[in-house]
Regions:
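Sec/Tat signal peptide C-region and signal peptidase I cleavage site
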Residues: 18-27
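A general "mature secreted/periplasmic domain" signal
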Residues: 28-156, 170-180, 184-271
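Bacterial N-terminal signal peptides that target proteins for export
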Residues: 1-12
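Long, charged amphipathic helices and adjacent flexible linkers at domain junctions
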Residues: 155, 160-167
């Protein structure tokens, strides 16, 4: 994953110089269309290099236009022609780390729909970019009004936020023959952004977030997600998969401080 702002973001005192040195223009809620368009052009270069990103309707974004909780904003990406798509990018243009997630789908994955919760730090365009199997990049856009999502405290001590870190649960819908199976993965992890102030010590909590999540059934990969601080605490990821046989589903995750977490889940029985 191309981190635009890497895990050196450990607090506002560090984050602001890092952003400035990276040449990232600071966003403002009152920015006009021209400023936002220029920022998107710069982000395309940072994330995709010289590759062309074309607008289109291959992937759609469903998010609340005005977020009730900027630290827990639900987002659903829906792919119009899933057989074309091998990966998805979610970019929150005006976040300190704009590239929220890059998801690559494996042979057991189904790109039809992907759900997660994200932090939105200020009024921002949000882009979803679908990468096709023939190498095209197709982007869609939505504007979201939110404020302070990356710096919002979790409402508990850091120690409490880290209790049970790495615990996982998986919920499955009914498995029907010849159809993709919806599933929801829940991982307990604070995903500290580095911009949250400890309400007791009044110091910034160092960044610690899940940077890679891989889901597989046996030797067949479902998806691999590379993430950053824009994914909300205690990530919840909704996805679809096409299981084969009875091999268990394995989840392996790592975080930016070297933590490793894994869990195995049995495959549900096929419904009649």
């Amino acid at each position: 994953m191309r981190h635009i702002i890497r895990e050196t973001v450990v607090g506002l005192a560090v984050a602001l110089p890092v952003l400035a040195s990276a040449g990232v223009a600071f966003a403002a809620a009152g920015d006009g269309d021209a400023e936002r368009a220029a920022r998107w052009q710069e982000l395309q270069k940072q994330v995709f290099g010289d590759r062309k990103v074309e607008p289109g309707k291959l992937v759609s974004i469903d998010m609340p236009v005005r977020a009730e909780d900027a630290a827990l904003v639900p987002v659903t990406l829906t792919v119009a022609d899933k057989d074309q798509v091998k990966g998805l990018y979610l970019i929150i243009d005006d976040n300190p780390a704009p590239l929220a997630a890059h998801v690559d789908f494996g042979p057991a994955g189904d790109p039809a729909q992907l759900k997660m919760r994200v932090r939105v730090n200020t009024y921002s365009n949000v882009h979803a970019v679908a990468e096709t199997k023939d190498g095209r990049l197709v982007a869609s856009e939505i504007f979201v009004k939110a404020s302070g999502g990356c710096s919002a405290p979790m409402g508990m001590t850091d120690a409490d936020a880290m209790k049970g870190m790495g615990d996982m649960r998986m919920k499955f819908s009914d498995l029907t023959a010849d159809k993709a199976m919806p599933a929801t993965l829940m991982i307990r992890h604070p995903n500290f952004s580095g911009m949250q102030m400890n309400q007791v010590s009044r110091e910034y909590t160092p960044a610690r977030y899940l940077d890679r999540i891989s889901v597989s059934q046996g030797a067949r990969n479902v998806f691999t997600l590379e993430g950053d601080i824009s994914i909300s605490s205690n990530p919840v990821i909704g996805f679809e998969m096409r299981p084969e046989g009875s091999a268990p589903i394995t989840v392996a995750a790592t975080d930016s401080q070297g933590g490793t977490f894994d869990h195995t889940f049995p495959v549900p029985a096929v419904s009649n």
